[in-house]
């Protein structure tokens, strides 16, 4: 790279509009959309689509709700010409859809293009020619007047040919290609000459499409260019002002949005931003940006994964996992703080209320996407993500302090493996840490009774280091009685329970925070169809975790438990 790039590159020209109005405007309705996936998108593919893939994508575009679809450059190849004829002759074009065909301003190409759409109910012929200084000088060696004459002569020929076919509802579109790099006064001169040649007026509108053929400036400069043209165009009331942003600088979406604020009525682009070089503006992102602002986009992406699968198949190009709204990871949070906020947002979000879940600008369900991948756990994650997955997939609602305790084990596992932990991975770890802790004590069965004072009496069949034993105790409820039976210095510090499922076969989960002797507190967990059994299993789990960890009370607890087992055996 150059130390001083100004010796090789010059900044884009700016537009002097002291009273520009677009910065104070908002977009309150959807523009007219035109998909150029089958033309601009197709010509940019390493392997252009065959007719079957083109037809599949055409049908997907119709299903989404697009009413203007650029289907081909018919004069470029017999394949493109035949595809247009197939759509017309097999009556595959819905009555409310207009197909668009592109041509350069050469007589033979124009005649071939118009012939390709003979018999169509509705069609737009789209003419373009480059007008910027570099193209005039380097590519065509032509003057401004010569370039304007090319556009006007092509327009007149298209008018004559289409006027001779009144059975078709014709629309004319003109693009001064390289508009974003051209002088504004010349762009206006050519555009006005073209609209005059077409005789744009009441009942005879035309589309003027202003492209960023090569994106060369910040989006605000393009917005200024659009507002400048919007204010000065002759016959503006009979012109649909369209934009066709490319993404060379990565700001095509912003350029399109600001252009709409500046007076544009229509946007051309491709699904997921396919197109030459870095692509055309992404119609999906534009539409869903409107949707998240409460503006109906008039396009249907309620099954966005199906749309993506179709586009990936037809284009033979993958959609990036970070692509807005549709990528595999765009609704995924690995960060602990993000996960915690999302989890709390889901818990508070009410049906039919304004969407306010942190970090999620749109409800994935609106796009037909599930919540399964919203929170995923790796070494960067915290307790919130782990807790959310256990809740959603396995029905375990861990109390907050248990979340903190278990998150340490999760962190150790993900640090060790360097891999993402799935919901099943987390459940397996939880089972190993809590549910399957059966040494040195293992619960087998129990019987409950009440004595004359109303206290609970319990008899528990257990194993101690693999040896059967029976312990008995009394207390104020089953847990208190069980602790009495264990004859250990155990205190229950906290207790939580919940049903994991509904119905006759429902299971209960219990979480017990215990302290053995003067050791730190720790949790145990148990699951069973019986709530009492689940709570007893949780106590055993908590005690075993303390004993296996070698806390201060271990020696005393082991000695006492051994004595009890010997007495009762």
Swiss-Prot record:
Signal peptide positions on this chain: none
Annotated Pyruvate carboxyltransferase domain residues: 31-305
Annotated GO biological process: L-leucine biosynthetic process
Binding-site residues for Mg(2+), renumbered to this chain: 40, 244, 246, 280
UniProt pathway: Amino-acid biosynthesis; L-leucine biosynthesis; L-leucine from 3-methyl-2-oxobutanoate: step 1/4
Compartment list: Cytoplasm
Gene Ontology cellular-component annotations: cytoplasm
Keywords: Amino-acid biosynthesis, Branched-chain amino acid biosynthesis, Cytoplasm, Leucine biosynthesis, Magnesium, Metal-binding, Transferase
EC number: 2.3.3.13
InterPro entries: 2-isopropylmalate_synth_dimer, AIPM/Hcit_synth_CS, Aldolase_TIM, IPM_Synthase, LeuA-like_post-cat, LeuA_allosteric_dom_sf, LeuA_N_DRE-TIM, PYR_CT
CC cofactor: Mg(2+)
GO molecular function: 2-isopropylmalate synthase activity; acetyl-CoA C-acetyltransferase activity; magnesium ion binding
Matching Gene3D superfamilies: 3.30.160.270, Aldolase class I
Renumbered residue ranges of the record's region Regulatory domain: 437-569
Reaction(s) catalysed (UniProt annotation): 3-methyl-2-oxobutanoate + acetyl-CoA + H2O = (2S)-2-isopropylmalate + CoA + H(+)
Protein family per UniProt: Belongs to the alpha-IPM synthase/homocitrate synthase family. LeuA type 2 subfamily.
HAMAP family: LeuA_type2
Subunit structure: Homodimer.
Record's function text: Catalyzes the condensation of the acetyl group of acetyl-CoA with 3-methyl-2-oxobutanoate (2-ketoisovalerate) to form 3-carboxy-3-hydroxy-4-methylpentanoate (2-isopropylmalate).
UniProt protein name: 2-isopropylmalate synthase
Organism: Cupriavidus taiwanensis (strain DSM 17343 / BCRC 17206 / CCUG 44338 / CIP 107171 / LMG 19424 / R1)
């Amino acid at each position: 790279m150059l130390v001083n790039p100004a010796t090789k590159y010059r900044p884009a020209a700016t537009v002097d509009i002291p009273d520009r109005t677009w910065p104070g405007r908002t977009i309150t309705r959807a523009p007219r959309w035109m998909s150029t996936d089958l033309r601009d998108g197709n010509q940019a593919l390493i392997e252009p689509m065959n007719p079957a893939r083109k037809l599949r994508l055409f049908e997907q575009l119709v299903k989404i709700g697009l009413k203007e679809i650029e289907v081909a450059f018919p004069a470029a190849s017999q394949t493109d010409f035949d595809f247009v004829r197939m759509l017309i002759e097999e009556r595959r074009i819905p009555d409310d859809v207009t197909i668009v065909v592109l041509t350069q301003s050469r007589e033979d190409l124009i005649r071939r293009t118009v012939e390709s759409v003979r018999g169509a109910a509705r069609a737009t012929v789209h003419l373009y020619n480059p007008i910027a200084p570099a193209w005039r000088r380097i590519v065509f060696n032509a003057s401004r007047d010569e370039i304007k004459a090319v556009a006007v002569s092509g327009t007149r020929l298209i008018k004559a040919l289409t006027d001779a076919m009144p059975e078709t509802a014709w629309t004319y579109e003109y693009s001064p290609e390289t508009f974003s790099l051209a002088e504004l006064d010349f762009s206006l001169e050519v555009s006005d000459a073209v609209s005059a040649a077409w005789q744009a007026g009441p009942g005879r509108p035309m589309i003027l499409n202003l492209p960023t053929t090569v994106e060369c400036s910040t989006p605000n400069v393009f917005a200024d260019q659009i507002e400048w043209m919007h204010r000065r165009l002759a016959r503006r009331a009979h012109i649909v002002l369209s934009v066709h942003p490319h993404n060379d600088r990565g700001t095509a979406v912003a350029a399109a949005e600001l252009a709409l604020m500046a007076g544009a009525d229509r946007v051309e682009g491709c699904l997921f931003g396919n197109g030459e070089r870095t692509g055309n503006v992404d119609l999906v992102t534009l539409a869903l940006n409107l949707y998240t602002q409460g503006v109906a986009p008039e396009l249907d992406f309620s099954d966005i994964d199906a749309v993506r699968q179709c586009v990936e198949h037809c284009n033979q190009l993958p959609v990036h996992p970070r692509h807005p709204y549709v990528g595999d990871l765009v609704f995924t949070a690995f960060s602990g703080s993000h996960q915690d906020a999302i989890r709390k947002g889901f818990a508070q979000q009410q049906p039919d209320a304004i969407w306010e879940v942190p970090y999620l600008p749109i409800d994935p369900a609106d796009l037909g996407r599930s919540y399964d991948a919203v929170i995923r756990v790796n070494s960067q994650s915290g307790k919130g993500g782990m807790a959310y997955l256990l809740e959603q997939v396995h029905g375990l609602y861990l109390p907050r302090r248990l979340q903190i305790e278990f998150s340490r084990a999760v962190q150790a596992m993900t640090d060790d493996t360097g891999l993402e932990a799935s919901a099943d991975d987390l459940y397996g770890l939880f089972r190993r840490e809590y549910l399957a802790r059966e040494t040195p004590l293992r619960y087998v069965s129990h019987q409950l009774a009440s004595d004359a004072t109303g206290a609970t009496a319990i008899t528990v069949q257990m194993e101690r280091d693999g040896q059967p034993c029976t312990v008995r105790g009394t207390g104020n409820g089953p847990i208190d009685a069980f602790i009495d039976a264990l004859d250990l210095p155990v205190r229950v510090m906290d207790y939580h329970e919940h049903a994991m499922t509904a119905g006759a076969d429902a299971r209960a989960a219990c979480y017990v925070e215990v302290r053995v002797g003067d050791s730190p507190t720790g949790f145990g967990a148990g699951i069973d169809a019986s709530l009492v059994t689940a709570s007893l299993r949780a106590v055993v789990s908590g005690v075993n975790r303390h004993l296996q960890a070698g806390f201060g009370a271990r020696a005393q607890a082991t000695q006492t438990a051994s004595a009890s087992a010997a007495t009762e055996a």
